[in-house]
């Protein structure tokens, strides 16, 4: 429980760093393990950092022996869907082989509490909305498949081994720490909210909307945006749940509220008071028109209730991106 050391793998990244903040606030000792290929050293502010790669078993063994964590939170992964189609081998090497190496090291060290960052991309194209955890899992790209393979491995580790896990399937993570210490910072950026904010700030030539003829209330895609601090809270609750002996479980993390791209852009204009050019272009292959979570199970199992709405997501993201010293 509180006071325990937690190894946060990928803890220098966007969601991992916000989770370190929440862990520290709740009395845990987060130790970041990161190769800093996508993470940021300046995001490691709430505990020590150990540099290393999840494919390096000897380095993992060394770090686990040194810090003796009670649980592992695993965020480290390649995440860009488009890149996964161009270079699937890297995604399998990092997301599958890397995770299996981490799991082997964890088992050898006697760690049996593991929280895994998964994704709603494991569901593939939704057959019904909102999606609950019983929805079939038929991922449609290599990124989603790598996460699904790890989910299956974790189920086997639970059934035939001694490792219990909480699999957290995120919907659209967004927003930033309200004190502006950390926020979303990807290179290159592909997520809608930072791209639209950059357009409002004049840092890019407007914003492109992929598809305006979907069967949704205004023709644009619907997504479930969840504040990164709500995600962080769910991860800390998942650690507590496992350390108290909870059984392995997979949970959706979303608000249950869908927002269209047009609604999102309108909300960003309202917060920023800066109109920006929007271009409507053709649909993007593989995009689902609606992805919204049923989050009842996370509420039941973890007592988790999202605290922040879309306006708070956008306000915190705006404050972060508008800081002139950011990147």
UniProtKB/Swiss-Prot annotation:
GO biological process assignments: galactose catabolic process via UDP-galactose, Leloir pathway; polysaccharide biosynthetic process
Catalytic residues identified in the record: 143
Domain of life: Bacteria
Pfam families: GDP_Man_Dehyd
Its EC number(s): 5.1.3.2
Family matches, as CDD domains: UDP_G4E_1_SDR_e
Pathway given in the UniProt record: Carbohydrate metabolism; galactose metabolism; Glycan metabolism; exopolysaccharide biosynthesis
Annotated substrate binding sites: 119
Catalytic reactions on record: UDP-alpha-D-glucose = UDP-alpha-D-galactose
Cofactor(s) the protein needs: NAD(+)
Record keywords, A-Z: Carbohydrate metabolism, Exopolysaccharide synthesis, Galactose metabolism, Isomerase, NAD
Molecular function terms from GO: UDP-glucose 4-epimerase activity
NCBIfam families (alphabetical): galE
Recorded family membership: Belongs to the NAD(P)-dependent epimerase/dehydratase family.
Protein name: UDP-glucose 4-epimerase
Organism in which the protein naturally occurs: Rhizobium leguminosarum bv. trifolii
């Amino acid at each position: 429980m509180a006071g325990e050391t937690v190894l946060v793998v990928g803890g220098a990244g966007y969601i991992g760093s916000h989770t370190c903040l929440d862990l520290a606030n709740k009395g845990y000792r987060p130790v970041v393990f990161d190769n800093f290929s996508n993470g940021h050293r300046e995001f490691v502010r709430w505990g020590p950092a150990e540099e290393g790669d999840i494919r390096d078993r000897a380095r993992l063994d060394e770090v686990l022996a040194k810090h003796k964590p009670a649980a592992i939170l695993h965020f480290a992964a390649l995440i860009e869907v488009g890149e996964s189609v161009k270079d699937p081998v890297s995604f399998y090497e990092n997301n599958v082989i890397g995770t299996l190496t981490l799991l082997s090291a964890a088992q050898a060290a006697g760690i049996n509490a593991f929280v895994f960052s998964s994704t709603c991309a494991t569901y593939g194209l939704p057959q019904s909305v909102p999606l609950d955890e019983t929805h079939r899992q038929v991922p449609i790209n290599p990124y989603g498949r790598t996460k699904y393979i790890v989910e299956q491995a974790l189920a086997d580790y639970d059934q035939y081994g001694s490792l219990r896990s909480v699999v957290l399937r995120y919907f659209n993570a967004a927003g930033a720490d309200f004190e502006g210490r950390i926020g979303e910072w990807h290179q290159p950026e592909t997520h809608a909210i930072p791209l639209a904010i950059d357009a409002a700030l004049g840092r890019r030539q407007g914003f492109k909307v992929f598809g305006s003829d979907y069967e949704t209330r205004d023709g644009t895609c619907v997504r479930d945006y969840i504040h990164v601090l709500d995600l962080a809270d769910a991860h800390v609750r998942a650690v507590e749940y496992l350390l108290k002996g909870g059984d392995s479980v997979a949970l959706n993390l979303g608000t249950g509220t869908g927002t269209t791209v047009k609604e999102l852009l309108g909300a960003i204009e309202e917060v920023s008071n800066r109109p920006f050019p929007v271009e409507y272009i053709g649909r993007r292959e593989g995009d689902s028109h609606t992805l919204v979570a049923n989050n009842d199970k996370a509420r039941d199992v973890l007592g988790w209730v999202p605290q922040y709405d879309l306006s708070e997501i956008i306000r915190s993201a705006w404050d972060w991106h508008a800081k002139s010293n950011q990147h």
